[in-house]
Every structure is written in C-alpha cells, then in structure tokens.
C-alpha cells in the first residue's frame, strides 16, 4: 500500500472497530462492509471515511494525479489508536461514546 493512503485506511479501521456492528453485534469489520444487511446500519462517518479511502486508492492509479500527487504522505496520526484497538486495549463504552460524538459532529 502506498504511504499516502495509510492514514485513511487506519481511520476506516478505527471507525469500523467502534461501530455497533463490531462492538455490539460482534461481527468482524469485513462482514460489516460486505453484508448489505449489516452495511446499512454503519455510521455515516464510517461510510464517508471509506469513500475517502477508496478515492485515495483510485488516485494512486489515476494518471492525471501522477504529476500533482495523490495526497500527503502518511502522518502516523492514527497509529497509536489503531494499535490499541488491534490489541484489545480499549474500553468499549468509551469507544462507543467517541463514535457517537464524531457522528453527531458530522451531522451538524
């Protein structure tokens, strides 16, 4: 994976880990994305981040962006959060509150 899309990829992974589909219903993130029944209940924030990630990936092969560049290189902004979620070092209630807060900010 090109370095310019790593932050978007981790943002999607974190959002999916915080989603009710994973936290409450105990599905894995891939099932939440692939299954249309589960997919319709994903938070808008996760869907928006997924679209940004896919646009970034599309930009990698887009010849018009070869000269202007796709996006800035990865900043490592989500590395620690991603690491904690992967290793299970988190409080599920706190993560659900973060998702609700982020989702409510996006609707405003």
Curated annotation (Swiss-Prot):
Residue ranges of the motif Cx10C motif: 21-32
Alphabetical keyword list: Disulfide bond, Mitochondrion
Pfam families assigned to the protein according to its UniProt record, in alphabetical order: Pet191_N (PF10203)
Residue span, CHCH domain: 18-64
Annotated PROSITE patterns: CHCH
InterPro entries: Cyt_c_oxidase_assmbl_Pet191
UniProt GO BP: mitochondrial cytochrome c oxidase assembly
Disulphide bond pairs: 21-56, 32-46
A cellular-component GO term for this protein: mitochondrial intermembrane space
Motif Cx9C motif: positions: 46-56
Compartment(s): Mitochondrion intermembrane space
Transmembrane keyword on record: no
Function of the molecule: Involved in the assembly of cytochrome c oxidase.
Family to which the UniProt record says this protein belongs: Belongs to the PET191 family.
Domain free text: The twin Cx9C motifs are involved in the recognition by the mitochondrial MIA40-ERV1 disulfide relay system and the subsequent transfer of disulfide bonds by dithiol/disulfide exchange reactions to the newly imported protein.
Protein name: Mitochondrial protein PET191
Gene that specifies this protein: PET191
């Amino acid at each position: 994976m090109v370095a310019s899309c790593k932050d978007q990829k981790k943002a999607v992974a974190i959002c999916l880990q915080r989603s009710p589909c994973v936290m409450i219903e105990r599905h894995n993130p891939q099932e939440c994305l692939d299954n249309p029944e589960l997919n319709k209940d994903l938070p808008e924030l996760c869907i928006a981040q997924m679209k940004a990630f896919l646009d970034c990936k599309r930009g990698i092969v887009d010849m018009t962006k070869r000269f202007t560049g796709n996006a800035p290189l990865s900043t490592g902004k989500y590395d620690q959060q991603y690491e904690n979620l992967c290793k299970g070092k988190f409080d599920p209630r706190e993560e659900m509150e973060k998702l609700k807060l982020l989702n409510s900010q996006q609707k405003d």
